[in-house]
């Protein structure tokens, strides 16, 4: 009887993936209603850490890369960063009021020139790894690459919502979706660390252009 009851609460790997994705989105949405700054808006990141570790994915196994994987990581990161960065540089001023967008970031996160640079470094380094660890390392194998990339894009839409017009935020999600597909393919071919390096380089491009456009640097 005890085994039967326990089995009722045991989810299949696919179900665990969807449950984790929904929980992550729920926490991301809740960040808009919690007045705890970075802590409240960053609760969904705990989901990114917990579920892969609970699934037995060991961090130390992810830090393996060969020369081929490094070359692919750097090439794909520069390629994607250059394309996405160019699109943002030329299109964002036409879809968003840059002054209002900057005021939105400052109001939500209380940025100064110093703190926004620190935040950008954390996003490029640590946040990009958490996203790769969760989406590519955990969710890809449980929900499939298209679903994983869709949730990845939707998470960015939820987090960015309210900072700019809805069309601008949705367009950002449309850019993020193919990036998620690409990093999944890099991970399948070369491993998770390669996907992370590619993601990190892309974020450096995008954050640098964003800081420039918004007048932080």
Task: Tell me what each language-model feature is.
Residues 1-11:
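Short, Lys/Arg-rich, polar N-terminal cytosolic tail immediately upstream
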Residues 11-60, 105, 109:
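Alpha-helical transmembrane segments in multi-pass membrane proteins
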Residues 26-31, 48, 52, 80-88, ...:
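Alpha-helical transmembrane segments of multipass membrane proteins
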Residues 29-36, 90-96, 157-163:
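Juxtamembrane "helix-exit" motif on the non-cytosolic side of transmembrane helices
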Residues 33, 55-58, 86-94, 153, ...:
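Hydrophobic membrane-targeting alpha-helices
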Residues 62-127, 216:
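Juxtamembrane helix-loop-helix connectors linking adjacent transmembrane helices
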Residues 116-217:
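Transmembrane helix-loop-helix hairpins at the membrane interface
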């Amino acid at each position: 009887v005890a085994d039967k009851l326990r089995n009722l609460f045991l989810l299949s790997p696919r179900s665990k993936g969807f449950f984790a994705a929904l929980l992550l989105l729920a926490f991301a949405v809740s960040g808009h209603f919690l007045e705890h700054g970075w802590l409240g808006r960053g609760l969904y990141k705990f989901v990114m850490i917990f579920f892969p570790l609970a699934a037995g994915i060991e961090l130390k196994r992810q830090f393996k890369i060969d020369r081929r994987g490094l070359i692919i990581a750097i090439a794909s990161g520069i390629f994607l960063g250059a394309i996405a960065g160019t699109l943002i540089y030329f299109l964002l001023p036409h879809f968003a009021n840059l002054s209002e967008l900057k005021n939105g970031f400052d109001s939500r996160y209380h940025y100064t020139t110093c703190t926004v640079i620190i935040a950008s470094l954390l996003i490029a380094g640590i946040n990009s790894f958490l996203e790769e660890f969760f989406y590519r390392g955990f969710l890809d194998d449980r929900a499939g690459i298209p679903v994983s990339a869709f949730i990845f894009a939707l998470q960015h839409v939820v987090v960015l919502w309210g900072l700019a017009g809805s069309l601008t935020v949705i367009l950002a999600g449309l850019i993020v979706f193919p990036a998620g597909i690409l990093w999944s393919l890099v991970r399948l071919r070369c491993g998770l660390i390669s996907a992370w390096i590619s993601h990190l380089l892309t974020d450096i491009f995008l954050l640098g252009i964003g800081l420039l456009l918004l007048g932080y640097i």
